């Protein structure tokens, strides 16, 4: 005769202790009286009403942990029924006078008369088919690729493993084989001797080094206290620069493992950190005090930072040209207002452009018109054979000269339309960038743009070869001067990964916990003991048998922080193959009465 219900159901949200406008109450509707009564009227969550006799049972977290409560429709009194303190009571259901619910991975039943929950011993015979180890095709999980200096081989990371793969012919090698660790962002050293990568095998992200011929890895960093974002080799292979979640720029000497923090910002992370071709400078972009991104160069020997752009415009993604003449970057300086059709205002879109900073005051702009000169013939001096090798070495490593004074006045724009530009690279003659329509190249001499590919491009350390990723395939070519030939993909057929789901799920759980530890907007984690919360939910990991189980546990863990928009990506969830079936249908027509008729 009456109905107890919730107006809103948000129990699937990974947000505990919620007391906002979506926190629900239990409502009772009387059809005869056409009345509605709020029987909880509490700022906490009151959900899952179950009507048994004169009592309405429901879940509530008014006492912090979600427990069963009961409301007596005669006395109008509410009392607490269960007193669990470690895990929430979840998803109750009633049948007759019995209520069943889940708590901490166990099923309980409770008689409404006794109000005493009893644990139900459940034994399930299962093959655990979704938890069995299996071999997967690693080419479907590629996250990064890096070419060897001459482009004969590449290192590819896929599903937390590092592969050493031949570009043409040879043997594919999984050089890590760690199903319980997440390896990523492997890069070949410019001298070709080593492969560096990031791994969380110790429980924290650390940098590792491995001989390109194989062998045991060497741990370069130790006792790291936060997430390593990205890293880059120096051109001489002697140093590595990397950034982390504490907004630090760290310089690592590879031979002695000496670590120097050269910069730390309270405003934000440094992005796109890279070396100059002579190893003496770094460049990066970072947010300034007005929240606009500025491009900087850093003198490694002098230990001093210099701004290249001013703070009136957003500037980012800097990279040195390989000849050492230019600093190439993108900046939002194109003001092309579009008048709104719905309001009395302008909007600004496609403000980005590609810019060159002329590092030396002696470097002429590539767009400066030149005057014709008369060529004068002269007899070339005889070359000194003893100095050939010395000259060759000097030519191969350009000296980067940066005149800081007046550098903001030596910035020129490539004649390109306003857009978004990414993945910059330049050899001093051509500038490459990814934008709408794919990878493009601008020839500074011809002052002409060419389309290279619809796939993004990465260049080898020697600046001779390029790798493209398209349609789950990798392609290696000479650095193109026009349209790239992507007709021959690299053979990835032997990228086989042995997936141990039990170890992989434990790693995912741990990385999810660290992601919140390192990235949460408050260091005090809303006053919660984040380590204790990890231990609380890690106790359930041995019982995880599917990815959905893992997602549920991670969701419960991050829900303890009591914050919105903290979601769990479902990841690789198995689903059964279903037989497609037809569905019943009906022909519908409108009747003269105003109703619809089923024909």
Go through the PLM ranges and name each one:
Residues 141-160, 415-436:
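Beta-strand-rich domains and repeat architectures in extracellular enzymes and scaffolds
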Residues 13-16, 91-96, 105-106, 269-272, ...:
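Short beta-alpha junctions and helix-cap segments that line functional grooves
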Residues 33-37, 75-79, 114-118, 169-173, ...:
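Beta-strand initiation motifs
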Residues 126-142, 400-417:
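A short helix->beta-strand "capping" segment at the edge of beta-propeller domains
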């Amino acid at each position: 005769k009456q109905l107890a219900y919730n107006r809103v159901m948000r129990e699937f949200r990974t947000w505990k202790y919620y007391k906002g406008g979506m926190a629900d109450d239990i409502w009772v509707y009387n059809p005869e009286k056409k009345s509605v009564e709020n029987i909880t009227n509490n700022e906490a969550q009151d959900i899952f009403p179950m009507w048994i006799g004169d009592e309405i049972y429901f879940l509530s977290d008014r006492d912090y942990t979600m427990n069963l409560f009961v409301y007596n429709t005669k006395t109008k009194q509410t009392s607490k029924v269960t007193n669990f303190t470690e895990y929430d009571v979840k998803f109750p259901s009633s049948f007759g006078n019995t209520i069943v619910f889940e708590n901490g991975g166990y099923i309980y039943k409770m008689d409404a008369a006794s109000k005493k929950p009893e644990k139900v011993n459940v034994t399930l015979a299962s093959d655990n088919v979704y938890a069995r180890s299996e071999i997967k095709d690693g080419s479907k999980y590629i996250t990064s690729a890096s070419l060897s200096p001459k482009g004969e081989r590449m290192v590819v990371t896929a599903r937390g493993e590092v592969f050493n793969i031949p570009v043409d012919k040879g043997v594919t090698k999984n050089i890590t084989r760690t199903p319980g660790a997440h390896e990523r962002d492997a890069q070949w050293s410019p001298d070709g001797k080593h492969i560096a990568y990031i791994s969380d095998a110790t429980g924290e992200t650390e940098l590792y080094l491995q001989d390109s011929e194989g062998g045991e890895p060497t741990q370069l960093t130790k006792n790291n206290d936060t997430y390593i974002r990205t890293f880059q080799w120096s051109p001489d292979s002697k140093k590595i620069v990397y950034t982390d979640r504490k907004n630090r720029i760290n310089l690592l000497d590879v031979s002695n493992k000496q670590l120097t923090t050269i910069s730390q910002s309270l405003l934000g992370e440094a992005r796109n950190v890279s070396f100059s071709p002579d190893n003496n400078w770094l460049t990066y972009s970072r947010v300034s005090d007005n929240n606009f991104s500025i491009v900087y160069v850093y003198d490694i020997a002098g230990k001093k930072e210099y701004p290249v752009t001013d703070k009136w415009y957003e500037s980012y993604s800097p990279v040195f040209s390989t000849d050492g003449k230019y600093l190439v970057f993108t900046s939002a300086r194109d003001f092309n207002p579009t008048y709104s059709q719905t309001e009395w205002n302008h909007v600004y879109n496609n403000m980005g452009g590609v810019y060159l900073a002329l590092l030396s005051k002696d470097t002429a702009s590539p767009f400066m018109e030149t005057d014709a000169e008369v060529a004068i013939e002269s007899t070339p001096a005889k070359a000194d054979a003893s100095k050939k090798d010395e000259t060759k070495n000097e030519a191969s490593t350009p000296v980067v000269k940066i005149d800081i004074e007046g550098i903001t006045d030596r910035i020129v724009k490539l004649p390109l339309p306003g857009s978004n530009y990414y993945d910059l690279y330049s050899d001093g003659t051509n500038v490459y960038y990814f934008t709408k329509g794919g990878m493009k190249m601008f020839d500074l001499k011809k002052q002409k743009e060419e389309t290279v590919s619809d796939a993004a491009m990465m260049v080898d350390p020697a600046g001779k070869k390029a790798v493209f990723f398209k349609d789950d395939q990798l392609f290696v070519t000479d650095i193109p001067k026009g349209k790239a030939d992507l007709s021959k993909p690299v053979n990835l057929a032997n990228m086989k990964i042995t997936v141990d789901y039990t170890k992989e799920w434990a790693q995912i759980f741990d990385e999810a916990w660290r992601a919140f530890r390192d990235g949460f907007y408050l260091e005090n984690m809303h006053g919660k003991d984040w380590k204790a919360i990890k231990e609380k939910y890690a106790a359930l990991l041995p019982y995880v048998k599917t990815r959905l189980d893992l997602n549920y546990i991670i969701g419960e863990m991050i829900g303890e922080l009591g914050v919105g928009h903290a979601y769990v990506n479902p990841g690789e969830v198995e689903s059964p193959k279903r037989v497609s079936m037809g569905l019943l249908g009906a022909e519908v027509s409108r009747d003269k009465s105003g109703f619809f008729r089923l024909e």
